[in-house]
Design a protein with these regions (language model features):
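ATP-dependent adenylation/nucleotidyltransferase module used to activate substrates
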Residues: 1-158
């Protein structure tokens, strides 16, 4: 069978890794996991600042869903953060605007373009990844915002 999907693997019984993970999820005790999550979040709720959890968002579904669940299902006060991509698509920009308009606070960070060009050039020449600077920015900006807003808890999407 041709493999057209990156990272697709099959075990000795011919079951793909996505199906293997799906089977494992059926054996997880979700009730005990939910109780553990609620205990964990109750500690974070003791933080009486404006925000008690940070959620990176990009304009896609994962981070927005995480922020929504934390806010509406678990009563958290999320602050969303995004690192503006070098070539932002209109759909992502529109999604972020809709996200903010639906009641979320968002910190949007534009990295220094001179520094970004240098990191991107190094990323391209050394590892063949022209947006390496943005990848680095995504991870460092999230932590920097957490420190600046004194938020101890970060929930990522995917």
């Amino acid at each position: 069978m041709p493999l057209s999907r990156p990272r697709m693997q099959f075990n000795s019984q011919g079951i793909c890794n996505a199906c293997q993970w799906s089977l494992k999820k059926k054996r997880i005790n979700w009730n005990s996991r939910t109780k553990l999550l609620k205990r964990f979040l109750s500690n974070a709720k003791k933080n009486k600042r404006d925000f008690n959890v940070l959620v990176p968002v990009s304009g896609g579904k994962d981070g927005s869903y995480v922020a929504h669940m934390l806010k509406h299902k678990y009563g958290m006060r999320p602050l969303a953060v995004t690192a503006t991509p070098p070539l932002q698509l209109e759909v992502g920009s529109t999604n972020l605007k809709n996200f903010v308009n639906s009641g979320y606070d968002l910190v949007s960070v534009d990295a220094n373009p001179t520094v970004m060009r240098k990191i991107n050039t190094a990323g391209f020449t050394e590892i063949g990844f022209p947006y390496y600077g943005w990848l680095v920015a995504i991870h460092t900006i999230v932590l920097q915002v957490a420190v600046n807003f004194n938020i101890d808890l970060i929930f990522y999407g995917e």
